[in-house]
Amino acid sequence: MALFGALFLALLAGAHAEFPGCKIRVTSKALELVKQEGLRFLEQELETITIPDLRGKEGHFYYNISEVKVTELQLTSSELDFQPQQELMLQITNASLGLRFRRQLLYWFFYDGGYINASAEGVSIRTGLELSRDPAGRMKVSNVSCQASVSRMHAAFGGTFKKVYDFLSTFITSGMRFLLNQQICPVLYHAGTVLLNSLLDTVPVRSSVDELVGIDYSLMKDPVASTSNLDMDFRGAFFPLTERNWSLPNRAVEPQLQEEERMVYVAFSEFFFDSAMESYFRAGALQLLLVGDKVPHDLDMLLRATYFGSIVLLSPAVIDSPLKLELRVLAPPRCTIKPSGTTISVTASVTIALVPPDQPEVQLSSMTMDARLSAKMALRGKALRTQLDLRRFRIYSNHSALESLALIPLQAPLKTMLQIGVMPMLNERTWRGVQIPLPEGINFVHEVVTNHAGFLTIGADLHFAKGLREVIEKNRPADVRASTAPTPSTAAV
């Protein structure tokens, strides 16, 4: 009985679980590109290492090592991998760091000073980034693990006191190696929890698309990593800006991502597009009013000829009044995605009337229009764009079958009017697109769209339009390195 109850609760929870409207998969194919950009960023961060001055005394010799700066990172071997539980793991082995520092030596009344180059060799770094969902639904670096070690140090001392420095070099280089070991992991911890999070802050969560609607890209759960990819589930739901708490129930199928051949895949379900169209419908945007000169001249003449019998019965003051054509969508359009293509079904009312000045309008006809549009999706940069095309069009009377027959001559000119006057306006808006949840400075290239039953996927490669350093510097928060919590680092001496 207890087992039955547990099963029932599990099924009940599953029945109420909301599917994501948008999914993104980053595959291992992207890791080489990400690693190249990440290592450039890492080298720049390691150059910010601040090593305390090293002072000491050996016999009558007093030495001071100061102004230690990391000048370069030379890599022999590095790997970036997905790891379950850890998300991203970077391993650097047998690398070397170039350093430059100021030396000062005092022996009785003799003083020597200057700058010298050194190198830290056999540098190994193993650092992992743990990704999670924060309370606002944003992806964050929630933890950074780190192990770092420097095997040996070498400093090319020279000059009059070369033999003295050679005598002291063991003390100096051992001390520098110890201090350097202690500084690598704190720098990486700050880079992950502060700087990389400032990059992730550029990913839209709840943002405006235009003056009418917004979109919710909040993560529904923590990112899930396997050995070959990283999967993220986003709500992917539009909403009217005047009803920010409104939500369309998601009854669409869950999009599936199986491919791993491209760097990244994005999947959108029918719910993603349905919520967009319903949001615009609720915002009152799906209507069109043409009056007087706004009605195409040929269509004006055809409409007057079609309703000539009704017009001649009106008073002379009304007969030559401006014509009004009003299209109003009656219900939220719906999207259907099949392997053969994507279609959008629309039902609207069409009202034709005369609008004499300073008098009530005179309605000539009211009809219903059924239209089916084909939709082609494309991903450009980081914007999902849509191109619409009118495929099927039918009008019929709300009153009688006889009047529906009389409307047949209007079918072609009304369709032409929609294709020439309405579709360009729609496409101007839909081709502007909506941004997908991607950090600033990263774009998609070489996109391929594939339709499935109930959802579509877009495979693409990644392109860094801006470097990580450029984006992070633009969005860098106030430096909180001093207040950062103690790093979970392990530095091997």
UniProtKB/Swiss-Prot annotation:
Q: Does the keyword Iron-sulfur apply?
A: no
Q: Which residues form the signal peptide?
A: 1-17
The record's similarity note reads: Belongs to the BPI/LBP/Plunc superfamily. BPI/LBP family.
Tell me the InterPro entries matching this sequence.
Bactericidal_perm-incr_a/b_dom, BPI/LBP, BPI/LBP/Plunc, Lipid-bd_serum_glycop_C, Lipid-bd_serum_glycop_CS, Lipid-bd_serum_glycop_N
Instruction: Give Gene Ontology CC terms.
Output: extracellular region; extracellular space; high-density lipoprotein particle; nucleus
User: One Pfam annotation, family name?
Assistant: LBP_BPI_CETP_C
Kindly provide the PTM information from the record: Glycosylation is necessary for secretion and its phospholipid transfer activity.
What gene name is given for the protein in this entry? PLTP
| Reactions catalysed according to its record | a 1,2-diacyl-sn-glycero-3-phosphocholine(in) = a 1,2-diacyl-sn-glycero-3-phosphocholine(out); a 1,2-diacyl-sn-glycero-3-phosphoethanolamine(in) = a 1,2-diacyl-sn-glycero-3-phosphoethanolamine(out); a 1,2-diacyl-sn-glycerol(in) = a 1,2-diacyl-sn-glycerol(out); a 1,2-diacyl-sn-glycero-3-phosphate(in) = a 1,2-diacyl-sn-glycero-3-phosphate(out)
Which SMART domains is this protein grouped with?
BPI1 (SM00328), BPI2 (SM00329)
Query: What PANTHER family is this protein classified in?
Result: BACTERICIDAL PERMEABILITY-INCREASING BPI PROTEIN-RELATED, PHOSPHOLIPID TRANSFER PROTEIN
Where is this protein localized, as stated in its record? Answer: Secreted; Nucleus
Keywords for the protein's UniProt record, in alphabetical order: Disulfide bond, Glycoprotein, Lipid transport, Nucleus, Secreted, Signal, Transport
This one is known as Phospholipid transfer protein
GO biological-process terms attached to the record: ceramide transport; flagellated sperm motility; glycolipid transport; high-density lipoprotein particle remodeling; lipid metabolic process; lipid transport; phospholipid transport; positive regulation of cholesterol efflux
Consequence recorded when altering residue 96 to A: Significant reduction in phospholipid transfer activity. Increased secretion
Q: What is the effect of changing residue 143 to A?
A: Increased nuclear localization
Where are glycans found on this sequence?
64, 94, 117, 143, 245, 398
Primary site of residence: secreted
Tissues and organs where the protein is expressed, per its UniProt entry? Widely expressed. Highest level of expression in the ovary, thymus and placenta, with moderate levels found in the pancreas, small intestine, testis, lung and prostrate. Low level expression in the kidney, liver and spleen, with very low levels found in the heart, colon, skeletal muscle, leukocytes and brain. Expressed in the cortical neurons.
Q: GO molecular function terms here?
A: ceramide binding; ceramide transfer activity; cerebroside transfer activity; cholesterol transfer activity; diacylglyceride transfer activity; diacylglycerol binding; high-density lipoprotein particle binding; low-density lipoprotein particle binding
Q: Which cysteines are cross-linked by disulfides?
A: 146-185
| Protein function | Mediates the transfer of phospholipids and free cholesterol from triglyceride-rich lipoproteins (low density lipoproteins or LDL and very low density lipoproteins or VLDL) into high-density lipoproteins (HDL) as well as the exchange of phospholipids between triglyceride-rich lipoproteins themselves. Facilitates the transfer of a spectrum of different lipid molecules, including diacylglycerol, phosphatidic acid, sphingomyelin, phosphatidylcholine, phosphatidylinositol, phosphatidylglycerol, cerebroside and phosphatidyl ethanolamine.
